[in-house]
């Protein structure tokens, strides 16, 4: 049994002073953790150590008895920690429990603790600057990396310790002691974590509280970031803040952002796609697009993102309207106010032509017909339309915005564009929004007219009809009679063809 002598000594020392081990974690483990490594005493039912240790080891063990660990353990540790000097300092015996009336009986070490105790001493000697916590982390990682053969010596030693412990303390019951110091630290850490968790929620709530003012309830539902961002813009649901959009960037943002933020229907490609990117072929083919299909993809609110754009560009205005539709009055009014001032007089004349279109528009969306009458001064129309989410605005929008040329012209003439926006806004603010975007995209292709080809040919005329464009074009507005887009709708409404589907969708909201 000379083989076991070192083990016995080690066990006694561990029982007396495991707490004195260099690392508090070790003492904690030994006293408190049944089986940190998962290979605890329960799983180590075999006691093969006596047989497994080579016969020649006793001599080595005797030599290293001062190390308090059998050679097999030391060899295993040194294998894992290759290159370390294997001079284990004698285990400091801190008589924690012995001083008390009843000396505290520590639980037998499990395999991991056996490994950690031996390896920690070695590492601590070699790297005295290492913090115990770092040592423990490293030891745990190394232990997980060990294979069964490498763990066997520790497992066997742990089993031996368990059996010995049972002999020494037959009545032993595990009664974990409260570690006040540890508990306090843990409690503090827990509190800190709780605080960290709470603070985000509080922030989120605060954001939500603010968000209702800036954005609709939907935006509130979205992440706090959106709320804060939207506070800048109209109340439209999850649309991009108006302030964010710059005239140049408005197209991309409207098209791209509205879907993610406000577009509940991410499927809409047009929002994400800059029509400018589309080839003229694609645009020309777009004519064949069913407006209703487009509407499907447009959010019922219109493009929430639209509000983001200010009346910067006509199509922007239209978008604004759509977003106005979403946020109907506030965004729409803002757009209107901006756009109305310059264009109202010119728009009024064009509005007369739109009125004719309005009747055809009813085909698209009867609810929106009323909007056509609002065509009065754009300012009025815009405001009215904005307030009349979708119906009137959509109607007008169809009439005016459908033609890509209109957009391109608007792009060319920013002031006129503003006028267009208001005009479109009144008609479409809610209803137009989906189309506005598409148109907007098309606008990006000023060749979008091909996209609207029916509207495009008419578009120029259409916009011409609108004072927004050149007066010459205004007359053409009536000619907009391109029915290619909307055969059912009068030629004038060819742009409306787009709008009609929009009406359906806009009306839905």
Swiss-Prot record:
Known outcome of mutating residue 297 to L/S/D/F: Impaired ability to activate transcription in vitro
Which Gene3D superfamilies has this protein been placed in? High mobility group box domain
Q: Where is the composition biased (Basic and acidic residues)?
A: 56-67, 160-174
Where is this chain compositionally biased, Pro residues type?
341-376
Q: Give me the ranges of the annotated region Transactivation domain (TAC).
A: 394-509
Subcellular localization(s) per the UniProt record: Nucleus
The annotated consequence of residue 278 to S reads: Impaired ability to activate transcription in vitro
One Pfam family name is: HMG_box
Changing residue 169 to Q: what effect?
In CMD1; mild form overlapping with small patella syndrome; decreased 50% transactivational activity
**Region: Dimerization (DIM), residue numbers:** 63-103
User: Motif 9aaTAD 2 located where?
Assistant: 290-298
Q: What GO cellular component is one of the record's annotations?
A: transcription regulator complex
Q: Where is the composition biased (Polar residues)?
A: 42-52, 380-415, 485-509
Q: Major place of localization?
A: nucleus
Q: Where is this region: Disordered?
A: 1-67, 160-273, 330-415, 479-509
Q: Where is this cross-link: Glycyl lysine isopeptide (Lys-Gly) (interchain with G-Cter in ubiquitin)?
A: 398
Map motif 9aaTAD 3 onto the chain.
Answer: 460-468
| Low complexity compositional bias, start-end | 30-41
Subunit and interaction comment: Homodimer; homodimerization is required for activity. Interacts (via C-terminus) with ZNF219; forming a complex that binds to the COL2A1 promoter and activates COL2A1 expression. Interacts with DDRGK1. Interacts with EP300/p300. Interacts with beta-catenin (CTNNB1); inhibiting CTNNB1 activity by competing with the binding sites of TCF/LEF within CTNNB1.
Q: Which disease is it linked to?
A: Campomelic dysplasia: A rare, often lethal, osteochondrodysplasia characterized by congenital bowing and angulation of long bones. Other skeletal defects include unusually small scapula, deformed pelvis and spine, and a missing pair of ribs. Craniofacial and ear defects are common. Most patients die soon after birth due to respiratory distress which has been attributed to hypoplasia of the tracheobronchial cartilage and small thoracic cage. Up to two-thirds of affected XY individuals have genital defects or may develop as phenotypic females.
Q: What is known of its domains?
A: The transactivation domains TAM and TAC (for transactivation domain in the middle and at the C-terminus, respectively) are required to contact transcriptional coactivators and basal transcriptional machinery components and thereby induce gene transactivation.
Question: What name does the UniProt record give this protein?
Answer: Transcription factor SOX-9
What species does this protein belong to? Homo sapiens (Human)
What are the top taxonomic ranks of the organism? Answer: Eukaryota, Metazoa, Chordata, Craniata, Vertebrata
């Amino acid at each position: 049994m000379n083989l076991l002598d070192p083990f016995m000594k080690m066990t006694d020392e561990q029982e007396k002073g495991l707490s004195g081990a260099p690392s508090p974690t070790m003492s904690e483990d030994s006293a408190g953790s049944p089986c940190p490594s998962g290979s605890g005493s329960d799983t180590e039912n075999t006691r093969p150590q006596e047989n497994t240790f080579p016969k020649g080891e006793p001599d080595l063990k005797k030599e290293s008895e001062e190390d308090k660990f059998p050679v097999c353990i030391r060899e295993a540790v040194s294998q894992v920690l290759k290159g370390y000097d294997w001079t284990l300092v004698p285990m400091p015996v801190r008589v924690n429990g012995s001083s008390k009336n009843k000396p505290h009986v520590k639980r037998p070490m499990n395999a991991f603790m056996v490994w950690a105790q031996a390896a920690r001493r070695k590492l601590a000697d070699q790297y005295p600057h290492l913090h115990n916590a770092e040592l423990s982390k490293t030891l745990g990682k190394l232990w997980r990396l060990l294979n069964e053969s490498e763990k066997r010596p520790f497992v066997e030693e742990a089993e031996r310790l368990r059996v010995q412990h049972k002999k020494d303390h037959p009545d032993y019951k595990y009664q974990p002691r409260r570690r006040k110091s540890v508990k306090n630290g843990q409690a503090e850490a827990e509190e800190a974590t709780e605080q960290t968790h709470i603070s985000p929620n509080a922030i989120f709530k605060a954001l939500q509280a603010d968000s209702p003012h800036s954005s609709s309830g939907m935006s509130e539902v979205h992440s706090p970031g959106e709320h804060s961002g939207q506070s800048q813009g109209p109340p439209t649901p999850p649309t991009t803040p108006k302030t964010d959009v710059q005239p140049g960037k408005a197209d991309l943002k409207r098209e791209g952002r509205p879907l993610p933020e406000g577009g509940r229907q991410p499927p809409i490609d047009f929002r994400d796609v800059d029509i400018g990117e589309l080839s003229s072929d694609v645009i020309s083919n777009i004519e064949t697009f069913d407006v209703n299909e487009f509407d499907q993809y447009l959010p019922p609110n219109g493009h929430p993102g639209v509000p983001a754009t200010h009346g910067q560009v006509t199509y922007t205005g239209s978008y604004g309207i759509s977003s106005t539709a979403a946020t109907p009055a506030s965004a729409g009014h803002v757009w209107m106010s901006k756009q109305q001032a310059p264009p109202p007089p010119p728009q009024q004349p064009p509005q007369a032509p739109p009125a004719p279109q309005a009747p055809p528009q009813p085909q698209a969306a009867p609810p929106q017909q009323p909007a056509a009458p609002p065509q009065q001064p754009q300012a009025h129309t815009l405001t009215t339309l904005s307030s009349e989410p979708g119906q009137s605005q959509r109607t007008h929008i169809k009439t005016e915005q459908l033609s890509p040329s209109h957009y391109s012209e608007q792009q060319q003439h920013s002031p006129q564009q503003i006028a267009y926006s208001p005009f479109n806004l009144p008609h479409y603010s809610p209803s137009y929004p989906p189309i506005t975007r598409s148109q907007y995209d098309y606008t990006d292709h000023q060749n979008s007219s091909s996209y609207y080809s029916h509207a495009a040919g008419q578009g120029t005329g259409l916009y011409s009809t609108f004072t927004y464009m050149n007066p010459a074009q205004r007359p053409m507005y009536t000619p907009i009679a391109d029915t290619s887009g909307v055969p059912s709708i009068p030629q004038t409404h060819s742009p409306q063809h787009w709008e009609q589907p929009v009406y359906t969708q806009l009306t839905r909201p």
